[in-house]
Amino acid sequence: MRKMLAAVSRVLSGASQKPASRVLVASRNFANDATFEIKKCDLHRLEEGPPVTTVLTREDGLKYYRMMQTVRRMELKADQLYKQKIIRGFCHLCDGQEACCVGLEAGINPTDHLITAYRAHGFTFTRGLSVREILAELTGRKGGCAKGKGGSMHMYAKNFYGGNGIVGAQVPLGAGIALACKYNGKDEVCLTLYGDGAANQGQIFEAYNMAALWKLPCIFICENNRYGMGTSVERAAASTDYYKRGDFIPGLRVDGMDILCVREATRFAAAYCRSGKGPILMELQTYRYHGHSMSDPGVSYRTREEIQEVRSKSDPIMLLKDRMVNSNLASVEELKEIDVEVRKEIEDAAQFATADPEPPLEELGYHIYSSDPPFEVRGANQWIKFKSVS
């Protein structure tokens, strides 16, 4: 009898030492999924669009929440490191636009392709790279995803082609990637992203034309965050209906602050392209909390009240959180646990990114070729042999 009482006492003692939130989460029965109504997309040259209701599973909801929180916290840490002068040079943050990168990835396959402009940190993460590799790239360290030589604008991963610094220049490249998919007979699509500021570039319309002529599996995606650097879309474009810019290419305008809207629209667009109908255009209406880059305080051309209103009414992370809690897909305590885990991951990555060594000077010309070239190149010094690996 004494042994039994002692055993019961040990069990109760162990339970009492666990955080109350963990005990609550472990004992609570959550719903496996829930159905939500989402905003209808505006359509151009399409008879029907994505569904206006969608099912979110508990598993997917927790995954999306963690990914968006990771992108948010990673960008805030980048802001901090930049202000400490540990990150130098160009740095464009995407906090506020997390539903775009996470939602797009949720709507495609890992074998599909993606190319974007210089606001690329979130996409680099959703394409499969770690926070460690991204922050180390921002700080110019050897452990970065581009060996510390690409920085904020030039990050790469498998089936992810950057990170491109020239405004709009990635759009023809995206059409070329889609051409390769079709030429090689692969059931793959290419997501080609650009901003509202780049939407007026002539090369974009040339890419539209070629993609339509050859019926390429290319999803042209305009991330409309309302401002091209410091110029509002109304001052920069005679028409702000970017989803209609393809003219002969079908298009849809999507609530880019709602991850479920983005996911369903991406699934719809990808299915359209895979069916052989050619390209399609998506406009994601979103918002960036930071300025254009770290050199832009972001409040000279918009008010602090405007930013705060978007944060309070349309924040993508809060929208998903409210849906999950109100539908019994998760509890507030469980999501707080995820927040704590994400913060720890970011801090660990930041420590690595500040302690990892910088690449040696002799490796400056390395990693240009995919395999070691059988020749020497005359550089600033003597004849040197470039290497593809270090």
Curated annotation (Swiss-Prot):
Changing S232A: Abolishes inactivation by phosphorylation. Pyruvate binds at H92, Y118, R119, A157, G165, V167, D196, G197, A198, N225, Y227. One of its GO terms (molecular function) is pyruvate dehydrogenase (NAD+) activity. The modification Phosphoserine is found at S232, S293, S295, S300. The modification N6-acetyllysine is found at K63, K244, K313, K321, K336. Thiamine diphosphate binds at Y118, R119, G165, V167, D196, G197, A198, N225, H292. It is an enzyme of class 1 (oxidoreductase). Ubiquitous. GO terms for cellular component: mitochondrial matrix; mitochondrion; nucleolus; nucleus; pyruvate dehydrogenase complex. Disulfide bonds: none annotated. Pyruvate dehydrogenase activity is inhibited by phosphorylation of PDHA1; it is reactivated by dephosphorylation. Heterotetramer of two PDHA1 and two PDHB subunits. The heterotetramer interacts with DLAT, and is part of the multimeric pyruvate dehydrogenase complex that contains multiple copies of pyruvate dehydrogenase (E1), dihydrolipoamide acetyltransferase (DLAT, E2) and lipoamide dehydrogenase (DLD, E3). These subunits are bound to an inner core composed of about 48 DLAT and 12 PDHX molecules. NCBIfam families: PDH_E1_alph_y. The pyruvate dehydrogenase complex catalyzes the overall conversion of pyruvate to acetyl-CoA and CO(2), and thereby links the glycolytic pathway to the tricarboxylic cycle. This is Pyruvate dehydrogenase E1 component subunit alpha, somatic form, mitochondrial. It comes from Homo sapiens (Human). The gene is PDHA1.
